Protein backbone atom coordinates (compact mmCIF):
# COMPACT_ATOMS: atom_id res chain seq x y z
CA UNK A 1 0.00 0.00 0.00
CA UNK A 2 1.28 3.45 -0.91
CA UNK A 3 2.13 5.46 2.18
CA UNK A 4 0.56 8.91 2.51
CA UNK A 5 2.81 11.83 1.58
CA UNK A 6 3.16 14.35 4.38
CA UNK A 7 4.20 17.93 3.77
CA UNK A 8 6.62 19.84 5.94
CA UNK A 9 3.73 21.69 7.58
CA UNK A 10 2.03 18.40 8.46
CA UNK A 11 5.17 16.97 10.07
CA UNK A 12 5.57 20.18 12.05
CA UNK A 13 1.98 19.99 13.27
CA UNK A 14 2.39 16.34 14.25
CA UNK A 15 5.40 17.23 16.38
CA UNK A 16 3.52 20.10 17.98
CA UNK A 17 0.50 17.90 18.56
CA UNK A 18 2.65 15.22 20.12
CA UNK A 19 4.03 17.79 22.54
CA UNK A 20 0.58 19.01 23.57
CA UNK A 21 -0.71 15.45 23.83
CA UNK A 22 2.18 14.76 26.17
CA UNK A 23 1.35 17.82 28.25
CA UNK A 24 -2.29 16.75 28.53
CA UNK A 25 -1.26 13.28 29.64
CA UNK A 26 1.21 14.56 32.19
CA UNK A 27 -1.32 16.92 33.76
CA UNK A 28 -3.13 13.81 34.92
CA UNK A 29 -1.92 13.17 38.52
CA UNK A 30 -1.56 9.49 37.70
CA UNK A 31 1.20 10.34 35.22
CA UNK A 32 2.69 13.41 36.87
CA UNK A 33 5.90 11.69 37.95
CA UNK A 34 8.18 11.97 34.89
CA UNK A 35 10.80 9.69 36.43
CA UNK A 36 8.35 6.80 36.54
CA UNK A 37 7.62 6.94 32.78
CA UNK A 38 10.13 5.48 30.32
CA UNK A 39 10.23 6.45 26.64
CA UNK A 40 8.46 3.33 25.40
CA UNK A 41 5.60 3.82 27.84
CA UNK A 42 5.40 7.50 26.94
CA UNK A 43 5.19 6.72 23.21
CA UNK A 44 2.42 4.23 23.90
CA UNK A 45 0.48 6.78 25.93
CA UNK A 46 0.75 9.43 23.22
CA UNK A 47 -0.26 6.93 20.52
CA UNK A 48 -3.24 5.81 22.56
CA UNK A 49 -4.36 9.40 23.12
CA UNK A 50 -4.19 10.16 19.39
CA UNK A 51 -6.10 6.99 18.51
CA UNK A 52 -8.80 7.81 21.05
CA UNK A 53 -9.06 11.47 19.96
CA UNK A 54 -8.57 11.52 16.15
CA UNK A 55 -10.73 14.61 15.73
CA UNK A 56 -8.23 16.68 17.70
CA UNK A 57 -5.39 16.12 15.25
CA UNK A 58 -7.76 16.42 12.29
CA UNK A 59 -8.96 19.81 13.50
CA UNK A 60 -5.40 20.92 14.21
CA UNK A 61 -4.28 19.98 10.70
CA UNK A 62 -7.28 21.76 9.20
CA UNK A 63 -6.47 24.91 11.16
CA UNK A 64 -2.86 24.73 10.01
CA UNK A 65 -3.95 24.41 6.36
CA UNK A 66 -6.31 27.37 6.74
CA UNK A 67 -3.55 29.51 8.25
CA UNK A 68 -1.15 28.56 5.45
CA UNK A 69 -3.78 29.34 2.79
CA UNK A 70 -4.46 32.72 4.38
CA UNK A 71 -0.76 33.54 4.53
CA UNK A 72 -0.31 32.60 0.86
CA UNK A 73 -3.29 34.73 -0.16
CA UNK A 74 -2.01 37.73 1.80
CA UNK A 75 1.39 37.39 0.12
CA UNK A 76 -0.30 37.18 -3.29
CA UNK A 77 -2.37 40.30 -2.58
CA UNK A 78 0.76 42.16 -1.50
CA UNK A 79 2.43 41.16 -4.79
CA UNK A 80 -0.68 42.34 -6.68
CA UNK A 81 -0.15 45.82 -5.26
CA UNK A 82 3.11 46.10 -7.20
CA UNK A 83 1.45 48.01 -10.03
CA UNK A 84 4.18 50.22 -11.47
CA UNK A 85 3.60 50.46 -15.22
CA UNK A 86 0.06 49.08 -15.07
CA UNK A 87 -2.55 51.20 -16.89
CA UNK A 88 -4.91 53.10 -14.59
CA UNK A 89 -8.46 54.43 -14.91
CA UNK A 90 -10.41 56.62 -12.50
CA UNK A 91 -8.58 58.63 -9.86
CA UNK A 92 -4.83 57.80 -9.80
CA UNK A 93 -4.82 58.81 -6.12
CA UNK A 94 -8.10 57.12 -5.15
CA UNK A 95 -8.18 55.59 -1.68
CA UNK A 96 -9.93 52.42 -2.89
CA UNK A 97 -8.00 50.35 -5.42
CA UNK A 98 -9.70 47.83 -7.70
CA UNK A 99 -7.74 45.51 -9.98
CA UNK A 100 -9.07 43.94 -13.17
CA UNK A 101 -7.32 41.13 -15.02
CA UNK A 102 -8.38 41.81 -18.59
CA UNK A 103 -7.91 40.73 -22.22
CA UNK A 104 -8.95 42.92 -25.16
CA UNK A 105 -10.38 39.92 -27.03
CA UNK A 106 -12.53 38.92 -24.05
CA UNK A 107 -16.25 39.32 -24.67
CA UNK A 108 -17.05 39.21 -20.95
CA UNK A 109 -14.49 41.97 -20.30
CA UNK A 110 -16.34 44.10 -22.84
CA UNK A 111 -19.63 43.22 -21.17
CA UNK A 112 -18.44 44.47 -17.77
CA UNK A 113 -16.72 47.53 -19.25
CA UNK A 114 -19.92 49.64 -19.32
CA UNK A 115 -20.84 49.03 -15.66
CA UNK A 116 -17.25 49.76 -14.62
CA UNK A 117 -17.28 53.06 -16.51
CA UNK A 118 -20.59 54.00 -14.86
CA UNK A 119 -19.20 53.28 -11.38
CA UNK A 120 -16.03 55.28 -12.05
CA UNK A 121 -18.14 58.21 -13.29
CA UNK A 122 -20.17 58.12 -10.06
CA UNK A 123 -17.29 57.60 -7.63
CA UNK A 124 -14.20 59.78 -7.86
CA UNK A 125 -12.27 58.00 -5.10
CA UNK A 126 -11.47 54.77 -6.97
CA UNK A 127 -8.13 53.90 -8.51
CA UNK A 128 -8.92 51.24 -11.11
CA UNK A 129 -5.82 49.30 -12.16
CA UNK A 130 -5.90 47.26 -15.35
CA UNK A 131 -3.80 44.12 -15.06
CA UNK A 132 -3.05 43.32 -18.69
CA UNK A 133 -3.56 39.55 -18.90
CA UNK A 134 -3.38 38.54 -22.59
CA UNK A 135 -4.44 34.90 -22.74
CA UNK A 136 -6.82 34.55 -25.69
CA UNK A 137 -4.80 35.38 -28.81
CA UNK A 138 -1.55 36.82 -30.11
CA UNK A 139 -3.41 40.05 -30.83
CA UNK A 140 -4.30 40.15 -27.12
CA UNK A 141 -0.59 40.38 -26.34
CA UNK A 142 -0.06 43.18 -28.88
CA UNK A 143 -3.04 45.06 -27.43
CA UNK A 144 -1.72 44.64 -23.88
CA UNK A 145 1.72 45.89 -24.91
CA UNK A 146 0.12 48.91 -26.60
CA UNK A 147 -2.03 49.59 -23.52
CA UNK A 148 1.06 49.80 -21.33
CA UNK A 149 2.75 51.98 -23.96
CA UNK A 150 -0.22 54.38 -24.14
CA UNK A 151 -0.15 54.62 -20.33
CA UNK A 152 3.41 55.93 -20.62
CA UNK A 153 2.22 58.63 -23.03
CA UNK A 154 -0.80 59.51 -20.89
CA UNK A 155 -3.43 58.53 -23.48
CA UNK A 156 -4.46 55.12 -22.16
CA UNK A 157 -8.11 55.88 -21.20
CA UNK A 158 -9.21 56.74 -24.75
CA UNK A 159 -7.25 53.81 -26.20
CA UNK A 160 -8.92 51.49 -23.69
CA UNK A 161 -12.40 52.82 -24.47
CA UNK A 162 -11.89 52.34 -28.21
CA UNK A 163 -10.80 48.72 -27.92
CA UNK A 164 -13.35 47.79 -25.26
CA UNK A 165 -16.18 49.13 -27.41
CA UNK A 166 -14.88 47.36 -30.53
CA UNK A 167 -17.46 44.61 -31.15
CA UNK A 168 -15.24 42.10 -32.91
CA UNK A 169 -11.82 40.51 -32.67
CA UNK A 170 -8.92 42.93 -32.73
CA UNK A 171 -5.92 43.06 -35.05
CA UNK A 172 -2.69 45.02 -35.16
CA UNK A 173 -4.41 47.53 -37.46
CA UNK A 174 -7.20 47.94 -34.90
CA UNK A 175 -4.67 48.40 -32.10
CA UNK A 176 -2.57 51.01 -33.90
CA UNK A 177 -5.66 52.89 -35.07
CA UNK A 178 -6.97 53.04 -31.49
CA UNK A 179 -3.60 54.32 -30.24
CA UNK A 180 -3.38 56.87 -33.03
CA UNK A 181 -6.92 58.14 -32.38
CA UNK A 182 -6.05 58.48 -28.68
CA UNK A 183 -3.18 60.78 -29.64
CA UNK A 184 -0.22 58.44 -29.20
CA UNK A 185 3.09 58.91 -30.98
CA UNK A 186 3.08 55.63 -32.94
CA UNK A 187 6.84 55.47 -33.44
CA UNK A 188 7.47 55.79 -29.69
CA UNK A 189 4.54 53.50 -28.96
CA UNK A 190 6.07 50.67 -30.99
CA UNK A 191 9.39 51.09 -29.20
CA UNK A 192 7.69 50.96 -25.80
CA UNK A 193 5.58 47.96 -26.83
CA UNK A 194 8.74 45.94 -27.39
CA UNK A 195 10.68 47.17 -24.37
CA UNK A 196 11.92 45.01 -21.51
CA UNK A 197 9.94 47.18 -19.09
CA UNK A 198 6.66 46.40 -20.85
CA UNK A 199 7.47 42.69 -20.91
CA UNK A 200 8.20 42.84 -17.18
CA UNK A 201 4.79 44.40 -16.44
CA UNK A 202 2.98 41.62 -18.33
CA UNK A 203 5.09 38.88 -16.77
CA UNK A 204 4.39 40.29 -13.31
CA UNK A 205 0.66 40.16 -14.04
CA UNK A 206 0.93 36.53 -15.15
CA UNK A 207 2.72 35.66 -11.93
CA UNK A 208 0.10 37.50 -9.91
CA UNK A 209 -2.74 35.68 -11.68
CA UNK A 210 -1.10 32.34 -10.92
CA UNK A 211 -0.66 33.23 -7.24
CA UNK A 212 -4.30 34.32 -6.96
CA UNK A 213 -5.49 31.31 -9.00
CA UNK A 214 -7.05 33.55 -11.64
CA UNK A 215 -7.09 31.64 -14.92
CA UNK A 216 -9.58 33.62 -17.00
CA UNK A 217 -10.83 37.11 -17.72
CA UNK A 218 -12.27 39.26 -16.40
CA UNK A 219 -11.07 38.82 -12.86
CA UNK A 220 -11.68 41.58 -10.33
CA UNK A 221 -9.95 42.01 -6.99
CA UNK A 222 -11.43 44.36 -4.39
CA UNK A 223 -9.61 44.28 -1.09
CA UNK A 224 -9.16 40.58 -0.36
CA UNK A 225 -12.20 39.57 -2.42
CA UNK A 226 -11.55 37.90 -5.77
CA UNK A 227 -14.43 37.96 -8.26
CA UNK A 228 -14.06 35.71 -11.32
CA UNK A 229 -16.13 36.60 -14.38
CA UNK A 230 -18.35 39.51 -15.35
CA UNK A 231 -20.59 41.15 -12.76
CA UNK A 232 -23.32 43.78 -12.88
CA UNK A 233 -22.91 47.39 -11.91
CA UNK A 234 -25.10 46.87 -8.84
CA UNK A 235 -22.98 43.92 -7.72
CA UNK A 236 -19.83 46.00 -8.16
CA UNK A 237 -21.33 48.84 -6.10
CA UNK A 238 -22.27 46.38 -3.35
CA UNK A 239 -18.74 44.95 -3.20
CA UNK A 240 -17.26 48.45 -3.08
CA UNK A 241 -19.59 49.42 -0.22
CA UNK A 242 -18.70 46.24 1.68
CA UNK A 243 -14.97 46.87 1.29
CA UNK A 244 -15.32 50.44 2.54
CA UNK A 245 -17.40 49.24 5.49
CA UNK A 246 -14.61 46.82 6.45
CA UNK A 247 -12.17 49.71 6.56
CA UNK A 248 -14.45 51.82 8.72
Residue ranges and their predicted role:
Residues 54, 113, 206:
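Short amphipathic alpha-helical/adjacent loop interface patches that line ligand
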Residues 79-96:
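A short beta-strand-turn-helix
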Residues 2-6, 16, 20, 27-78:
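N-terminal targeting signals for export/organelle localization
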Residues 66-67, 166-169, 181, 196-199:
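A short structural micro-motif
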Residues 9, 17, 33-39, 43, ...:
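C-terminal cap of thioredoxin/glutaredoxin-like
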Residues 99, 104, 110-180, 184-185, ...:
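Structural alpha/beta surface segment adjacent to cysteine/selenocysteine redox centers
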Residues 61, 91-92, 222:
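Short coil/turn segments at secondary-structure boundaries
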Residues 36-40, 51, 107-110, 137-141, ...:
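Soluble non-cytosolic domains of exported or imported proteins
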Amino acid sequence: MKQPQWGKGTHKMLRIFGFFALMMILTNPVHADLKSIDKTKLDEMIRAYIEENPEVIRNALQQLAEREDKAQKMAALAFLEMSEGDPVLGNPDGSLVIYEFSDYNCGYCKRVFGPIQDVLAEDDDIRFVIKEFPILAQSSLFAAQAAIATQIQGVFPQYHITLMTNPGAISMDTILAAARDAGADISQLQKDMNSAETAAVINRTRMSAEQLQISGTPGLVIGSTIIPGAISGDELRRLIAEERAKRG
